[in-house]
């Protein structure tokens, strides 16, 4: 088939590369426009656009995919299908209807669970033991279209969202190309999503990433892993924001108040609503990340001080 790939962040690259290496003809990519990035806030190409530039593939960057110029170019290219991974914009019906086989989306959850922008983060945050990826027909609803195929992946006890997303990006690439092959062969079958089991996964905010020391230790651990690497778990110490690396629940730890710090010879503990957690890395504003023990010595944590 003749295809145009729609996607924006780095997580879309494995699928884009797989499509480019498949039996299908990659005509162009559709991605979000250049956006400010870095401390200098200069305009930066999306990872998908940068990949396409290196490969000599045409790049389409409509501010909105309903723009007449974009729709005209889409019609002129005449794709049979548009595979999508994390494009980042709502696609209007007029664009969805242009390819013969529509737009086919790779989503990183087992639909209908975790529809929305942050399915992997919510799977980790809510303690799911099993997640996966789904390829479905894009329609106007939020991730509501019929599903062509799925794959599963176990969520490990130490998995961060970044770990899980990287695995799903690569395994999902194979699922997406297999669905494209089946569509071309006429063997693809899309099944409606179940009515039961629907959950939503809105984007996690910086406020969501603030550690809640009044939660049980297992929930603190989940929040830290869910928000790693983005938006980045954080807390405050002496009214200054600090970022946190991994934490480990300590089942036999001493009794501490929520957020209360205890500095021992080889570890730093912080209290929760249940048992404490061991801090991994800490990064103060303007500083590099360092082991929690080094941080505690540097700031001279005193008895009774807390993270908040």
UniProtKB/Swiss-Prot annotation:
Gene3D superfamilies: 3.40.50.12230
InterPro entries linked to this entry: Fmt, Formyl_trans_C, Formyl_transf_N, Formyl_transf_N_sf, Formyl_transferase-like_C_sf, Met-tRNA-FMT_C, Met-tRNA-FMT_N
Keywords associated with the record: Protein biosynthesis, Transferase
Binding site for (6S)-5,6,7,8-tetrahydrofolate: 109-112
Catalytic activity annotation: L-methionyl-tRNA(fMet) + (6R)-10-formyltetrahydrofolate = N-formyl-L-methionyl-tRNA(fMet) + (6S)-5,6,7,8-tetrahydrofolate + H(+)
CDD domains named in the record: FMT_core_Met-tRNA-FMT_N, Met_tRNA_FMT_C
EC assignment: 2.1.2.9
Domain of life: Bacteria
GO CC terms of this entry: cytosol
NCBIfam families hit by this protein: fmt
Cross-referenced PANTHER family: METHIONYL-TRNA FORMYLTRANSFERASE (PTHR11138), METHIONYL-TRNA FORMYLTRANSFERASE, MITOCHONDRIAL (PTHR11138:SF5)
Protein family according to the UniProt entry: Belongs to the Fmt family.
Cited function: Attaches a formyl group to the free amino group of methionyl-tRNA(fMet). The formyl group appears to play a dual role in the initiator identity of N-formylmethionyl-tRNA by promoting its recognition by IF2 and preventing the misappropriation of this tRNA by the elongation apparatus.
Name under which the protein is recorded: Methionyl-tRNA formyltransferase
Organism from which the protein derives: Salinispora arenicola (strain CNS-205)
Gene label: fmt
């Amino acid at each position: 088939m003749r295809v145009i790939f729609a996607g924006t962040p780095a997580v879309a690259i494995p699928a884009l590369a797989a499509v480019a290496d498949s039996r299908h003809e990659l005509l162009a990519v559709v991605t979000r426009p250049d956006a400010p990035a870095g401390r200098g806030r200069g305009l930066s190409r999306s990872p998908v656009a940068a990949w396409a530039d290196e490969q000599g593939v045409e790049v389409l960057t409509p501010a909105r995919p309903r723009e007449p110029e974009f729709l005209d170019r889409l019609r002129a290219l005449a794709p049979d299908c548009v595979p999508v991974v994390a494009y980042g914009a709502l696609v209007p019906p007029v664009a969805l209807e242009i390819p013969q086989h529509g737009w086919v989306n790779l989503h990183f959850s087992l639909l209908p669970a975790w529809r929305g922008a942050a399915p992997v983060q919510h799977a980790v945050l809510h303690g799911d033991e099993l997640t996966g990826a789904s390829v479905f027909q894009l329609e106007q609803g939020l991730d509501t279209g019929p599903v062509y195929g799925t794959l599963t992946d176990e969520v490990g006890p130490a998995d961060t969202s970044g770990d899980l997303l990287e695995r799903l990006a690569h395994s999902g690439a194979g699922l997406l190309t297999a669905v494209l092959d089946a569509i071309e062969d006429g063997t693809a079958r899309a099944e409606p999503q179940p009515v039961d089991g629907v959950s939503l996964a809105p984007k996690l905010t910086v406020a969501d990433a603030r550690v809640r020391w009044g939660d049980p230790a297992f929930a603190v651990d989940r929040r830290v892993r869910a928000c790693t690497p983005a938006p980045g778990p954080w807390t405050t110490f002496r009214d200054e924001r600090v970022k946190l690396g991994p934490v480990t629940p300590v089942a036999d730890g001493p009794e501490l108040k929520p957020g209360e710090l205890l500095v021992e010879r080889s570890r730093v503990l912080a209290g929760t609503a249940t048992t404490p957690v061991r801090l991994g890395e800490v990064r103060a504003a303007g500083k590099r990340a360092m082991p929690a023990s080094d941080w505690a010595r540097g700031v001279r944590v005193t008895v009774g001080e807390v993270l908040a």
